UniProtKB/Swiss-Prot annotation:
This is CAPA-Periviscerokinin-1. It comes from the Eukaryota. Belongs to the periviscerokinin family. InterPro entries: Periviscerokinin. Keywords: Amidation, Neuropeptide, Secreted. Mediates visceral muscle contractile activity (myotropic activity). It comes from Namaquaphasma ookiepense (Gladiator bug). GO terms for biological process: neuropeptide signaling pathway. Its main location: secreted. It is found in: Secreted. GO terms for cellular component: extracellular region.
Length: 11
């Protein structure tokens, strides 16, 4: 999921 700098999709 979101790490702050790079938004990752929550899968």
């Amino acid at each position: 999921e979101s790490a702050g700098l790079i938004p990752f999709p929550r899968v």
